[in-house]
C-alpha cells in the first residue's frame, strides 16, 4: 500500500509542476506578445507582420513572420540579439547588443514567436 501511496503522491506533484510550467510558459508568451506589439518596448510589429497578415505603412520593411515554431530558439535569439551576426546588411536593430531588450525580454519574445505557426505554403488554394 505504501508504494501505491508514494506513486500517487509523486504523480500528483508531477502533475502540479507540469501545470505550473504551462502557466509560466503562457505568461512568458503573453509578455513576449506585449513586447512585440508595444512601441516603447520591442515594437516588432512596426516592421513585421505575423500569421499571414500584411502591414501597410512606412515601417513594413521586415519580412512577414510565419512558421516560426519550427525555428531553433538559438537562431531566433541570435536574430533578435544581433541580426548582423548572420546578415551584416540587416536593417533590423540589435535589440540585445544595444541593450534595448534584456535577456529575459528576448526569451519572452521568442516564446511568443514560437506560437506563430502560419505558413503561406500550407494554405495555398
Regions found by a protein language model. Give the residues of each.
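Gly/Gly-Pro-rich "capping" loops immediately C-terminal to redox-active cysteine motifs
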Residues: 37, 49-81, 91-97
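Bacterial N-terminal signal peptides that target proteins for export
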Residues: 1-11
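The canonical Cys-X-X-Cys-His
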Residues: 32, 41-51, 109
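Sec-exported extracytoplasmic/periplasmic mature domains
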Residues: 37, 70, 81-85, 111-118
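C-terminal capping alpha-helices of c-type cytochrome domains
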Residues: 97-125
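Electrostatic cytochrome c docking/interface patches
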Residues: 19-39, 124-125
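Bacterial N-terminal signal peptides
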Residues: 10-18
